[in-house]
Curated annotation (Swiss-Prot):
Gene3D superfamilies: 3.30.70.860, YajQ-like, domain 2 (3.30.70.990). It holds the Pfam family DUF520. The keyword Nucleotide-binding applies. The keyword Nucleotide-binding applies. NCBIfam families: PRK05412.1 (NF003819). Belongs to the YajQ family. It comes from the Bacteria. This is Nucleotide-binding protein VFMJ11_1323. One of its GO terms (cellular component) is cytosol. CDD domains: YajQ_like. Nucleotide-binding protein. Keywords: Nucleotide-binding.
């Protein structure tokens, strides 16, 4: 019986490349010359540091652009509030890994409401979709791509 998994993952290598490119771009930008600003990647967390709140938003825009160039979906970013400490502003950005249980339930509900003849099962941080026809599975893929669930999804483990 054909099946596939719906997962939400961020490629850590591409994430590191995007942060490195953003750091290089930061070094060449005229408006950041002589400014204490930086990106710091630790695991799946990026810490941004700048001297001003406006510069912090500029750094987030630089990072978003570089993530898009590297093929990392910016919807996976979970941007925390800016923290002011001393003369610097800091902001943490986490990246969502895995399908959250609330979003998974929302996905299952959406799939069942579409009346496509498939079964959806939540398996930890992923969803397994099973159906009798490949066309039904492709219809579910299209449905998930069109829906706005606040998180990017990838389709893996397609079995026929």
């Amino acid at each position: 019986m054909p099946a596939f998994d719906i997962v939400s993952e961020v490629d850590n290598v591409e994430l590191k490349n995007a942060v490195d490119n953003a750091t290089r771009e930061l070094a060449t930008r005229f408006d950041f010359r002589g400014v204490d600003a930086s990106f710091e990647l630790k695991g799946e967390n990026i810490k941004i540091k700048a001297e001003d709140d406006f510069q912090l938003s500029q750094l987030v825009d630089i990072l978003r652009g570089n993530l898009a160039k590297r093929g990392v979906d910016a919807r996976a970013m979970d941007i925390k509030d800016a923290v002011h400490s001393g003369k610097n502003f800091y902001q943490d950005i986490d990246f969502k890994q895995g399908v959250d249980t609330l979003i998974a339930k929302k996905l299952v509900k959406e799939i069942k409401a579409s009346n496509i003849k498939v079964q959806a099962a939540i398996q930890g941080e992923q969803l397994r979709i099973t159906g009798k026809k490949r066309d039904d599975l492709q219809a579910v893929m299209a449905l998930v791509r069109e829906g706005d669930f606040g998180q990017p999804f990838q389709f893996t483990n397609f079995r026929d």
